[in-house]
Amino acid sequence: MSKVTGKVAQIIGPVVDVVFDSENAELPKIYDSLEITRKDGSILVLEVQSHIGEQTVRTVSMDSTDGLSRGVDVLATGNPIQMPVGKDVYGRLFNVIGDAIDGLGNLPKAGEDGLPIHRQAPKFEDLSVSTEVLFTGIKVIDLIEPYSKGGKIGLFGGAGVGKTVLIQELINNIAKGHGGLSVFAGVGERTREGNDLLREMLESGIIKYGDDFMHSMEEGGWDLQKVDKEVMKESKATFVFGQMNEPPGARARVALSGLTIAEYFRDGAGEGQGKDVLFFVDNIFRFTQAGSEVSALLGRMPSAVGYQPTLATEMGAMQERITSTKNGSITSVQAVYVPADDLTDPAPATTFAHLDATTVLSRKIAELGIYPAVDPLDSTSRILTADILGDEHYDCAQRVKELLQRYKELQDIIAILGMEELSEEDKLAVSRARRVQRFLSQPFHVAEQFTGLKGVLVDIKDTIKGFNMIMDGELDKYPEAAFNLKGTIEEAIEAGEKMLAEN
């Protein structure tokens, strides 16, 4: 079938109307991609959003429409946007339309070499039902809101409380310990963070560019001629970026582009064997925000707080694809920006419904200098049950929560009347709760250059032992400061002994 061509009729920012005047040809289908070849030879991709009239389609551009004019030829591809898949995507960086942005050349994505970004979620009978805990080495997460393998995890927090650092630490810990493949979708976040992440992954060996390149990088260079393409195939991560400076069309689709690569590895298509994949999204709120911009540009009536009326539908269509099947699993970690620290805002509230575990980052805890600034009372996990975790873990987690809840209730009394007015029992509870609160912090590998402290991974057995010792009163003699930013309880005891000796 010959490809259908049309002409640009109207351009309003990223929204482009295209007229197809041939009588017999079919209009492109919804979500099909159209291509415009610019004067400099570069290709601008449009995605069909709606049919208006008999011969006109309204599309959203995946790149800037600067310099575009009416009357330019548009080619209908007959397919949705395609992403390259296969072993060659290991260690590579792509944009929303599957073009390489790492300077190492494009990969083929036509026919069998690619997959469309719009796909159906797996059928119900293909889903996996087993529950297995995924330990991260981060005490507060493993103890109080444990993550499940193949589950969906949300990191909620306002601006600047540490979502991206926590995601980077999770990539570092899980990707190293888990040895599987990671796919990272950067959705509408800072380009600088994407650059930092790539360097971090190269230094930790999750992405491999070869020894020659690493020597040039250590000397301050970035010589892509030295990249070893064969060694690169041993990499354990793939990146897909659509950052803050991209038009809303790209930001609204880049999460789907990353997900398509993750689905390919989960299903084992072409390789015969499915894999366990980690899928990181930073930031899922920007996906909603871009959808809201596109919706307004397309002239749809806004709903609550100015969001698109299709908010729940769009979120559901994406989240239902992030799932585990009998072939393999996708464990997803999604950072969720919380506008004005309001968890009832429609964007974070819609995301909540899809998650198995939520890690809520709190500004109040960050202000105390406790990092990661996870709020143990607001954070939840579906698998925090004795059946899955065992009695010892479950009982310890519940005791920690009860103690912190008691401390929270007493804070108003302390603020008004002071500590002296509390009973002896409550004074003891407060002093232990403050130690527990500080011991929930730990130094991160990815923050070593800021803290000057070596990052640690803490085994769950050591975590449980440490918190039980604090709550049983075995460590009441040590000052609170001894417990801050420590890994195991032995480190805290050592620091406490030192402080006591100095006094």
Curated annotation (Swiss-Prot):
Pfam families: ATP-synt_ab, ATP-synt_ab_N, ATP-synt_VA_C. Its EC number is 7.1.2.2. It is a peripheral membrane protein. InterPro entries: AAA+_ATPase (IPR003593), ATP-synt_VA_C (IPR055190), ATP_synth_F1_bsu (IPR005722), ATPase_a/bsu_AS (IPR020003), ATPase_alpha/beta_chains (IPR050053), ATPase_F1/V1/A1_a/bsu_N (IPR004100), ATPase_F1/V1/A1_a/bsu_N_sf (IPR036121), ATPase_F1/V1/A1_a/bsu_nucl-bd (IPR000194). It is found in: Cell membrane. Keywords: ATP synthesis, ATP-binding, Cell membrane, CF(1), Hydrogen ion transport, Ion transport, Membrane, Nucleotide-binding, Translocase, Transport. It catalyses: ATP + H2O + 4 H(+)(in) = ADP + phosphate + 5 H(+)(out). PROSITE patterns: ATPASE_ALPHA_BETA. GO terms for cellular component: plasma membrane; proton-transporting ATP synthase complex. One of its GO terms (molecular function) is ATP hydrolysis activity. ATP binds at G157, G158, A159, G160, V161, G162, K163, T164. Produces ATP from ADP in the presence of a proton gradient across the membrane. The catalytic sites are hosted primarily by the beta subunits. Belongs to the ATPase alpha/beta chains family. PANTHER family: ATP SYNTHASE, ATP SYNTHASE SUBUNIT BETA, MITOCHONDRIAL. F-type ATPases have 2 components, CF(1) - the catalytic core - and CF(0) - the membrane proton channel. CF(1) has five subunits: alpha(3), beta(3), gamma(1), delta(1), epsilon(1). CF(0) has three main subunits: a(1), b(2) and c(9-12). The alpha and beta chains form an alternating ring which encloses part of the gamma chain. CF(1) is attached to CF(0) by a central stalk formed by the gamma and epsilon chains, while a peripheral stalk is formed by the delta and b chains. This is ATP synthase subunit beta. It comes from Christiangramia forsetii (strain DSM 17595 / CGMCC 1.15422 / KT0803). The gene is atpD.
